[in-house]
Amino acid sequence: MSRYRGPRFKKIRRLGALPGLTSKRPRSGSDLKNPLRSGKRSQYRIRLEEKQKLRFHYGLTERQLLRYVHIARKAKGSTGQVLLQLLEMRLDNILFRLGMASTIPGARQLVNHRHILVNGRIVDIPSYRCKPRDIITTKDKQRSKALIQNSIASAPREELPNHLTIDSFQYKGLVNQIIDSKWIGLKINELLVVEY
């Protein structure tokens, strides 16, 4: 199954807020999901919606998500927490969290078009897993810097997670450590995803 390219607001209305999917917001409260209309929700539906939230927020295919769950099960610690740490340490997500891109799909495009360097080397794989002490910069080309500058200028000033630091004048970001669970940007019950 390929990456989702359809209408994003339909997904937001059904699943709730997905900050990584789009930077736009619904105009009225009626655009968000209506809990009265949906009736009784089965356990299967609850688990499926949590999984879909994760998929659409991070822009993953079904196969990619299953691969991440498989890796998380093998690792030590809580499978759900390890899964979220793996997803949060992806290069496209880190660019989004640093404010270098307005959405995760926008960050994917920056990486695919070779505008991003990690530790001085071009990385064109959005799923690249960043490690502590990785330095993320842009190419020296004017076009690359202009794209990042526009994103940083237009991004709303949210509190930066403590595992990241950014120097907005040099267009440079630094991964300090692996993310702590309280800084994860999506409100989700990860245990339901693992159970699904």
Curated annotation (Swiss-Prot):
NCBIfam families for this protein: PRK05327.1, rpsD_bact
Function, as annotated: One of the primary rRNA binding proteins, it binds directly to 16S rRNA where it nucleates assembly of the body of the 30S subunit. With S5 and S12 plays an important role in translational accuracy.
Family assignment from sequence similarity: Belongs to the universal ribosomal protein uS4 family.
Species this chain originates from: Narcissus odorus (Campernelle jonquil)
Keyword annotations: Chloroplast, Plastid, Ribonucleoprotein, Ribosomal protein, RNA-binding, rRNA-binding
Gene Ontology MF terms: rRNA binding; structural constituent of ribosome
Subunit structure: Part of the 30S ribosomal subunit. Contacts protein S5. The interaction surface between S4 and S5 is involved in control of translational fidelity.
Stored SMART domains: Ribosomal_S4, S4
PANTHER family registered for this protein in UniProt: 30S 40S RIBOSOMAL PROTEIN (PTHR11831), SMALL RIBOSOMAL SUBUNIT PROTEIN US4M (PTHR11831:SF4)
S4 RNA-binding domain residues: 89-150
GO term, biological process aspect, one: translation
Annotated protein name in UniProt: Small ribosomal subunit protein uS4c
Main location: plastid
HAMAP family in alphabetical order: Ribosomal_uS4_B
Subcellular location: Plastid, Chloroplast
Listed GO CC annotations: chloroplast; small ribosomal subunit
Segments for region (Disordered): 15-41
Entry keyword Cytoplasm: no
SUPFAM superfamilies to which the protein is assigned, alphabetical: Alpha-L RNA-binding motif (SSF55174)
InterPro entries for the chain: Ribosomal_uS4, Ribosomal_uS4_bac-type, Ribosomal_uS4_CS, Ribosomal_uS4_N, S4_RNA-bd, S4_RNA-bd_sf
